[in-house]
Amino acid sequence: APVMGFQGMR
């Protein structure tokens, strides 16, 4: 799930 948050930060 953390990966999804990483994309949202970009």
Curated annotation (Swiss-Prot):
GO cellular component: extracellular region
Iron-sulfur recorded as keyword: no
Entry annotated with the keyword Iron: no
Assigned keywords, A-Z: Amidation, Neuropeptide, Secreted
Biological process annotations from GO: neuropeptide signaling pathway
Organism this protein belongs to: Oncopeltus fasciatus
Signal peptide: none
Chief localization: secreted
Arginine amide: residues bearing it: 10
Tissue: Expressed in the antennal lobe (at protein level).
Subcellular location: Secreted
Protein name: Tachykinin-related peptide 5
Cystine bridges: none
